């Protein structure tokens, strides 16, 4: 059984966004925010005028626009927003919704194809690379969204909204918490004829690599690999690409625990006669878990397949096993604040001629296995993907910002509001059930699996015995029969009371495929954590550039959109910036301090004069450092108000911190890649202080601030 995120064992899901641990009703009934002492030592001070923070604030902020804070009000809103067709509420970017808009654009000749064949998606004038290598292969079955994006890409119309950098693997041995040092430049070896390297069956005791054994980064160009250049070189020489940065060797598979089976690296054309990158369009059923404990990654990837425009940002459509095939592919990920293009060859780990890790339900399709390989390269090896959170992968796939919800501490109506509002705004959702530290991914009697990552793909209000019932559709990335078996599960008695037309409208399918429906009540009672990935206006702008579809013109009403700023920073004991939390009052002021000022349009200011803000701190390179025995640190963040007239041009002092409480903060320091704080305050100037729990812990981090307004920031 696959091992779920080790980070779960370390209480990664203890919500870092809960400022003071109040439930929502306590917040409504009592203005005293000091119900429970935070683990951070701070002096008590009066609550800032006009400011809201804590769990109560977060819950209250979610109800904006619903007209009420009770469950029935939220359900009425869901019924009003239900599409006229009767389909479940998802969001306009979901594959079916986006495809309908693009289909109409193609039908109305809004988009004029110039560089690809609109019938089959073939690139005009492309070389059939498979003719060289006798690997077979068929054309990709791109939908119209993929075809329009590919045509725009070939015309040079895409890429203005998002700068993508060539990926340069870091040398972990030289990582010194400053800017990561690139590998020593070297000339990559010329590609040679394809082979299938064999890794002998490992010994019982893992073998450590020799001290003088070169790492995969030793042969990396200082500038990284360029996909077009490398592919053209291979086509010209009639050779298949072999990645010098991520070779088909044991070093790419593991650093500590070798696979149990004898691994043979094979190209798709050596596994099956007619491989395809994508068959019949990408689908959430294309993602099935293999021998690696990366269900967190699979859950996010399955979620992304629901959004054509987001999917093709990760999997550029200008590659296939037919046109210009040369054994080389590339994929794009958000990586610590910037987008990178990761180039890989198509040699994949196999056992008995079957893919060993992630694979598609269709054995002729290979996009998901290749994405996993590129993601493994991004983080230094396949074993580095063992254990994580869906939130982490969702951010790397979208560039969005993810929040955690501890469902045990959240109001039911607020969680439903988050689901409805999030679906309307294009947010992505994941969820899980806390697992016992000694039992990995145990299946409960109701069919759900503890410590396992699920994705939430739809929400729908249905009439059952005259009463409104809210249903959620969930997806288990294992893609098998391990599904919910309670009310509204596949083939349950509840569905017999629903007419066939309604079931067809909301796409109800009874199959052992890992997808199932359940009531919101059962979801709230059984799941303990939920993750929401928020997307910015810039992401939607790029999607409009890719597809010609403007979100604002397709939604029922203009929704508020997030705007973002990012700042790089580091906690360095060498530079005197690793001050630790406020339990260390003498060193705490040494932490990096960021002055943030934001203004907001009138439409973003809510009735009480406040604006919703999300602050996130993400620590870098910790997954890559696992091979050196280092993992994520417990981190937190505090936000301080300078008042209506206050300004800051230099770092705040120990005296300031002793006399002022933060207006928002993380009270639980969590050993996770990223922590977030959501709060509501008037527009103005605030100082953000990210920190580790212990002083003198070294790490680099990325600070992000989301708000419905104009943002400015600087390091004090």
Swiss-Prot record:
Deletion consequences: Less reduction in body length and muscle cell area during starvation.
Domain Calpain catalytic: 240-536
InterPro entries from the UniProt entry: C2_III, Calpain_cysteine_protease, Calpain_domain_III, Calpain_III, Calpain_III_sf, Papain-like_cys_pep_sf, Pept_cys_AS, Peptidase_C2_calpain_cat
Enzyme class at the top of the EC tree: hydrolase
Alphabetized PROSITE patterns for the sequence: CALPAIN_CAT, THIOL_PROTEASE_CYS
Pfam families: Calpain_III, Peptidase_C2
Transmembrane portions of the chain: none
Region (Disordered): 31-53
Keywords: Hydrolase, Protease, Thiol protease
GO biological process: proteolysis
Gene3D superfamilies recorded: 2.60.120.380, Cysteine proteinases (3.90.70.10)
Annotated function: Calcium-regulated non-lysosomal thiol-protease which catalyzes limited proteolysis of substrates. Promotes starvation-induced muscle atrophy.
Protein name: Calpain clp-4
Naturally occurring in which organism (per UniProt): Caenorhabditis elegans
């Amino acid at each position: 059984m696959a091992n779920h995120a080790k980070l779960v064992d370390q209480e990664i899901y203890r919500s870092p966004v809960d400022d003071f641990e109040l439930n929502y009703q306590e917040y409504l009934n009592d203005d005293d925010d000091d119900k429970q002492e935070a683990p951070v030592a701070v002096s008590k001070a009066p609550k800032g005028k006009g400011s809201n923070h804590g769990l109560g604030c977060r819950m209250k902020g979610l109800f904006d626009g619903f007209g009420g804070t009770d469950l029935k009000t939220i359900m009425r809103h869901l019924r009003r927003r239900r599409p006229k067709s009767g389909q479940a509420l998802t969001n306009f970017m979901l594959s079916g919704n986006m495809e309908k808009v693009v289909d109409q654009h193609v039908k109305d000749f809004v988009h004029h194809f110039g560089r690809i064949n609109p019938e089959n998606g073939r690139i005009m004038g492309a070389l059939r690379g498979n003719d060289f290598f006798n690997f077979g292969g068929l054309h990709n079955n791109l939908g119209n969204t993929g075809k329009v994006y590919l045509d725009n890409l070939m015309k040079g119309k895409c890429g203005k909204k998002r700068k993508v950098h060539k990926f340069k693997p870091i040398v972990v041995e030289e990582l010194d918490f400053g800017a990561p040092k690139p590998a020593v430049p070297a000339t990559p070896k010329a590609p040679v004829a394809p082979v299938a390297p064999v890794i002998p069956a490992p010994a019982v005791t893992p073998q450590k690599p020799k001290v003088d054994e070169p790492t995969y980064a030793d042969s990396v160009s200082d500038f990284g690999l360029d996909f077009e250049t490398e592919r053209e070189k291979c086509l010209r020489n009639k050779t298949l690409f072999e990645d010098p940065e991520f070779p088909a060797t044991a070093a790419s598979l593991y650093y500590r625990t070798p696979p149990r089976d004898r691994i043979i690296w094979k190209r798709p054309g050596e596994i099956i006669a007619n491989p395809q990158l994508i068959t019949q369009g990408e689908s959430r059923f294309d993602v099935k878990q293999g021998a690696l404990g990366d269900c967190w990654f699979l859950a996010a990837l399955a979620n992304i397949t629901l959004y054509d425009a987001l999917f093709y940002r990760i999997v550029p459509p200008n590659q296939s096993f037919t046109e210009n095939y040369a054994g080389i592919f590339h994929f794009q990920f958000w990586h610590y604040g910037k987008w990178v293009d990761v180039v890989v060859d198509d040699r994949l780990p196999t056992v008995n001629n079957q893919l060993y890790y992630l694979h598609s339900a269709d054995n002729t399709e290979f996009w998901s296995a290749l994405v996993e390989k590129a993601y493994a390269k991004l983080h230094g090896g396949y074993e580095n993907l063992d254990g994580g959170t869906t939130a982490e992968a969702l951010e790397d796939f979208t560039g969005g910002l993810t929040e955690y919800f501890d469902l045990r501490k959240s109001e039911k109506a607020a969680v439903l509001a988050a689901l409805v509002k999030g679906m309307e705004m294009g947010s992505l959702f994941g969820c899980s059930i806390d697992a016992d530290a000694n039992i990995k991914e145990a299946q409960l009697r109701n069919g759900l699996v503890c410590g396992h990552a699920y994705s939430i793909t739809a929400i729908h209000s249905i009439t059952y015995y005259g009463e409104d019932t809210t249903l959620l559709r969930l997806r288990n990335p294992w893609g098998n029969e391990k599904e919910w078996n309670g009310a509204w599960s596949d083939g349950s008695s509840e569905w017999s009371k629903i007419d066939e037309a309604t079931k067809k409208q909301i796409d109800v399918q009874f199959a052992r495929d890992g997808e199932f429906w359940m009531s919101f009540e059962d979801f709230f009672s059984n799941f303990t954590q939920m993750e929401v990935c928020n997307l910015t206006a810039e992401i939607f702008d790029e999607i409009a550039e890719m597809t010609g579809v403007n979100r604002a013109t397709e939604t029922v009403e203009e929704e508020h959109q997030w705007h973002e700023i990012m700042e790089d920073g580091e906690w360095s004991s060498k530079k005197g910036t690793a001050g630790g939390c406020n339990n260390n009052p003498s060193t705490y002021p040494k932490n990096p301090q960021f002055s943030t000022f934001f203004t907001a349009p009138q439409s973003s200011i809510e009735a009480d004069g406040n604006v919703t803000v999300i602050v996130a701190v993400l620590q870098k390179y910790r997954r890559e450092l696992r091979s050196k025995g280092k993992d994520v640190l417990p981190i937190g963040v505090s936000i301080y108000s300078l008042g209506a007239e206050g300004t800051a041009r230099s770092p705040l002092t120990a005296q300031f911190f002793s006399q002022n409480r933060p207006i928002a903060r993380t009270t639980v320091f969590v050993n996770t890649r990223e922590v977030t704080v959501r709060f509501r305050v008037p527009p103005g100037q605030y100082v953000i202080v990210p920190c580790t729990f212990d002083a003198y812990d070294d790490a680099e981090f990325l600070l992000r601030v989301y708000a419905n307004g104009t943002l400015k920031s600087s390091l004090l």
